[in-house]
Design a protein with these regions (language model features):
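Short, low-complexity N-terminal tether/leader segments at secretion or assembly junctions of large
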Residues: 1-43, 223-236
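Extracellular and organelle-lumenal recognition/adhesion modules and their flexible linkers in secreted
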Residues: 34-340
Length: 340
């Protein structure tokens, strides 16, 4: 009897194209059970922008590369809470060509709680908008190791419902979810974030992720942190430096202003020079502006920010009572922070 079933070996590459298939020719009834599964999809193609953690690869360090404070913003979007004596957080560089952590990351974060810490150290990030992950099954993944011993690594997740919103809701908290070794390992944890149904959500809400470090003076290294809506962990999502920087600049940006007063007009008495700075990326909210390294070549005495929006701010520079000469330079560095 002639065979009527067509097997894959009967079809050459490119022989059947989408244009050859009638509408609805292939639907779920024609697919065998488990022909398409999450695991199989994870083994093939990955969705873009699936990682809700910003700067999980620790590529962006706008504020510097070494920190010793107890409550410091360190690598972009990462806030450290430490309670020991002389804690430290530093940027470390992978050996070129290493294969312990896949996809050739360049940097990782090293944390040390310092001496005599009284509680776990914390490496924190807030994912903007509590509704984004509410009610979803997510998988948290991280690569980590310790300089010595087998210290614990934990995870806390809670929902913050913003200004005037419902009270914080702890999704999970475990100080010893994983055990580190002196070799890089990938750790994962899957959990369903609580639904926000019935909650009041105010401004600046977020889902908080806290990596909890054992309270000892051992160096602990972390890399490639990812949070995705998935029942399993997929390989870390790589983004270009420019993509990651732009995402970080929604919350923090640094820049400078330099300008010159009129080259032909001398001003007497009190006078102010006015200029504006535009942000490269629209901020999450109107940011806090901090000025530094203010400089002028004439009698300006007071720098004041004004008209701060999510896209720009203005700077008024007041002169002293003696006035200013023509054509003098004014400059300042600035930072704009709109972190959660």
């Amino acid at each position: 009897m002639a065979r009527t079933t067509i097997r894959s070996e009967d079809i050459t590459a490119g022989q059947v194209k989408s244009a050859d298939l009638a509408s609805d020719a292939v639907d779920t009834a024609e697919l065998a059970n488990d022909a398409v599964t999450v695991a199989k999809m994870n083994d093939s193609a990955y969705l873009a922008n699936r990682n809700y953690i910003i700067n999980g690869n620790f590529d962006i360090w706008q504020r510097g590369t070494s920190f010793t404070g107890a409550n410091d913003w360190t690598a972009d979007r990462w806030l450290i809470h430490a309670n020991g004596t002389s804690p430290s957080t530093t940027q470390q560089t992978f050996t070129p060509g290493q294969t312990d952590v896949p996809n050739f990351p360049k940097y990782y974060l090293r944390y040390n709680a310092g001496t005599s810490p009284v509680d776990v150290g914390e490496v924190n990030q807030n994912v903007e908008d509590v509704g984004v992950l509410g009610g979803k099954e997510i998988t948290f993944s991280i690569w980590a190791k310790a300089a010595s011993g087998t210290p614990d690594l934990g995870l806390l997740i809670y929902q913050n419902f913003g200004s005037g919103g419902s009270a914080n809701n702890i999704v999970m908290s475990d100080n010893s979810l994983w055990t580190l070794s002196t070799s890089w390992q990938k750790f994962t944890h899957t959990v369903t974030i609580d639904s926000i149904t019935g909650k009041t959500v105010g401004a600046s809400s977020y889902t908080h992720f806290r990596i909890k470090m054992a309270h000892d003076a051992i160096n602990k290294d972390i890399s490639q942190v990812q949070v995705e809506v998935s029942p399993t962990a997929t390989p870390f999502e790589h983004k270009t430096y420019g993509q990651e920087l732009a995402a970080c600049q929604r919350y923090y940006e640094k820049g400078a202003m330099h300008w010159r007063t009129s080259p032909s007009i001398t001003w007497g008495g009190n006078y102010y020079a006015y200029n504006t700075a535009s942000f490269k990326v629209t901020k999450r909210a109107a940011p806090t502006i901090v000025l530094s390294n203010e400089y002028t070549t004439d009698g300006y005495s007071d720098y004041n920010t004004a008209d701060i929006t999510t896209d720009e701010f203005a700077l008024n520079v007041d002169s002293d009572s003696s006035g200013v000469s023509a054509g003098w330079w004014i400059s300042t560095d600035w930072t704009a922070e709109a972190e959660l």
